[in-house]
């Protein structure tokens, strides 16, 4: 079976993946490879599990691109904890346990453009029915319906479409939950980070304060057991605070509210922009550069984030100065964990004439 759970490790996901099944259903989206090439690759890859039957079908998607389905049956259960185990070249294979091989095979063969088979198909075992008796029709339970949907769906869109057609009332009343489960079943593959913000030279009266904070907290790695320090910048709008903060490297960026569902474990730092003190969730953990804490995403399950200590850059305009809303205890914690820079009149995080520095 294929399972997922929470984990703070992993480059592509914070989930723990496990697949163990003799029958495996694979989908290669936007994949133009020949079925024979895919099938022979799967046969060599799973030789230790004694492959008995492989079916690979190529068909066209609604947008005109090719994609391939494969049914792999082995004598021994195919076991892996690597969600990229079945990847071929740059094409990622979505892995599902084929709990109903008959239905999976029927689904794969619904509209084939090219097909390749090897071995002898092993049909699903059926319950014994005495001679002269017809098997009773049994209405599938919701669990069975959802199991079939999760087995056959190949994308978030197809998953939600199948839920809508099979369970219309649940889809209408619990759409948020289905959207969350769709995002967990079909997570986005993390792309290499590209910084969209050019570096800027700031025009400050006290550059040393910023430089002294940057070196140990952004440019240097943590020593074992060491925690970073955050940075608080308060000042007028259009002084380049946001552009400068976002130009330093890979980061989590939140403006107006914090969405934990998009938390990037590979980020070097966080940016909290224009979020009032009293409306910033987990502010103590963010300011204190803590790690391995539990958050509660909207419409999602509680999860652990921050596998490492990273600093947070907090940006505020003068009318939302965090220090004005703090109790003495808040101020004490803030000063112990966060450097502060209050912009004076005329100070900017860009030189006059630089493009993109007016945020």
From Swiss-Prot:
GO molecular function: ATP binding; DNA binding; endodeoxyribonuclease activity, producing 5'-phosphomonoesters; helicase activity; metal ion binding; nucleotidyltransferase activity; structural molecule activity
CC cofactor note: Divalent metal cations, possibly Mg(2+) or Mn(2+).
Pfam families to which the protein is assigned, alphabetical: Gemini_AL1 (PF00799), Gemini_AL1_M (PF08283)
One GO cellular component term noted in the UniProt record for this chain: host cell nucleus
Protein family per UniProt: Belongs to the geminiviridae Rep protein family.
Annotated ranges, domain CRESS-DNA virus Rep endonuclease: 18-121
Region annotation Transactivation: where it falls in the sequence: 258-276
Catalytic machinery residues: 107 (for dna cleavage activity)
Named cofactor requirement(s): Mg(2+); Mn(2+)
Region (Oligomerization): 181-193
Residue ranges annotated as motif RCR-1: 25-28
Residues noted as binding a divalent metal cation in the record, renumbered to the chain: 59, 67, 69, 111
Motif residue range(s): RCR-3: 107-110
Function: Essential for the replication of viral ssDNA. The closed circular ssDNA genome is first converted to a superhelical dsDNA. Rep binds a specific region at the genome origin of replication. It introduces an endonucleolytic nick within the conserved sequence 5'-TAATATTAC-3' in the intergenic region of the genome present in all geminiviruses, thereby initiating the rolling circle replication (RCR). Following cleavage, binds covalently to the 5'-phosphate of DNA as a tyrosyl ester. The cleavage gives rise to a free 3'-OH that serves as a primer for the cellular DNA polymerase.
Sequence motif: RCR-2, positions: 67-69
Coiled coil: none
Name of the protein in its database record: Replication-associated protein
Domain observations: There are 3 rolling circle replication (RCR) motifs. RCR-2 is probably involved in metal coordination. RCR-3 is required for phosphodiester bond cleavage for initiation of RCR.
GO BP of this protein: DNA replication
Top-rank taxon: Viruses
């Amino acid at each position: 079976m294929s399972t997922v759970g929470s984990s703070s490790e992993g480059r592509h996901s914070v989930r723990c993946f496990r697949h163990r099944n003799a029958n495996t259903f694979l989908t290669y989206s936007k994949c133009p490879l020949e079925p024979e090439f895919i099938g022979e690759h799967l046969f060599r890859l799973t030789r230790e599990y004694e492959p008995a039957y492989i079916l690979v079908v190529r068909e066209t998607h609604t947008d005109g691109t090719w994609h391939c389905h494969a049914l792999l049956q082995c004598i021994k259960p195919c076991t892996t904890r690597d969600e990229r185990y079945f990847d071929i070249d740059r094409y990622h294979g979505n892995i599902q346990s084929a709990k109903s091989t008959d239905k999976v095979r029927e689904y794969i063969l619904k509209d084939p453009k090219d097909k390749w088979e090897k071995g002898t198909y092993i049909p699903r075992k059926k319950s014994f029915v005495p001679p002269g008796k017809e098997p009773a029709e049994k209405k599938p339970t919701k669990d069975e319906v959802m199991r079939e949907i999760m087995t056959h769906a190949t994308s978030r869109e197809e998953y939600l479409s199948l839920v809508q057609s099979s369970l219309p009332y649940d889809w209408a009343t619990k759409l948020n939950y289905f959207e969350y489960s769709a995002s967990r079943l079909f997570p986005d593959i993390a792309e290499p980070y590209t910084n969209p913000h050019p570096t800027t030279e700031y025009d400050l009266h006290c550059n040393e304060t910023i430089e002294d904070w940057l070196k140990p907290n952004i440019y240097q790695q943590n020593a074992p057991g060491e925690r970073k320090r955050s940075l608080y910048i308060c000042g007028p709008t259009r002084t380049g605070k946001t552009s400068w903060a976002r130009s330093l490297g890979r980061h989590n960026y939140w403006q107006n509210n914090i969405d934990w569902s998009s938390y990037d474990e590979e980020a070097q730092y966080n940016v909290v922009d224009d979020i009032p003190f009293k409306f910033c969730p987990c502010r103590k953990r963010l300011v204190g550069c803590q790690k391995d804490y539990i958050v509660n995403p909207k419409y999602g399950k509680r999860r652990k984030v921050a596998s490492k200590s990273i600093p947070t850059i907090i940006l505020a305009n003068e009318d939302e100065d965090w220090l004005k809303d703090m109790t003495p205890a808040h101020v004490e914690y803030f000063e112990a964990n966060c450097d502060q820079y209050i912009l004076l009149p005329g100070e900017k995080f860009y030189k006059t004439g630089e493009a993109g520095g007016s945020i």
